């Protein structure tokens, strides 16, 4: 009888646990930059053979981040049901590689080093947001590692909607503008 009671109790717990979960939540949305514009690396004045992108620890996750500049300007948030397909640094690196690395014979070419500084959707009001993409880029000589040029970029694009989808699209547009 004792074994039967345990089995009945276990079955009841499983049934209750199944009901306790309630309806399934929203499905997790995974964003990337979509179809890249066509790039022609051959038009570049300097051949690039390698792209290195680094990012600070807070951008080293797939979280789609936003900031409520009008309310909590020092606080970062992440959308619960939306993520990037990869950390922003990886997405930016992939896009830049398509844009600047030309298939060329030989091992020549400079290195492009990029330090991603900011990659977020920023809300200036509850229904108004924009994408903010900031980075420092450095072109390094193929031999010896001497810096040829360096520049800081900050791009902003208005989001079409004040939600994760609008932020992801605006950030993708900012990244495409950087690469183009």
Model-derived regions: residue spans:
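Short secondary-structure boundary motifs at beta->alpha junctions and helix caps
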Residues: 73-82, 144-180
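Sec-dependent bacterial lipoprotein signal peptides
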Residues: 1-19
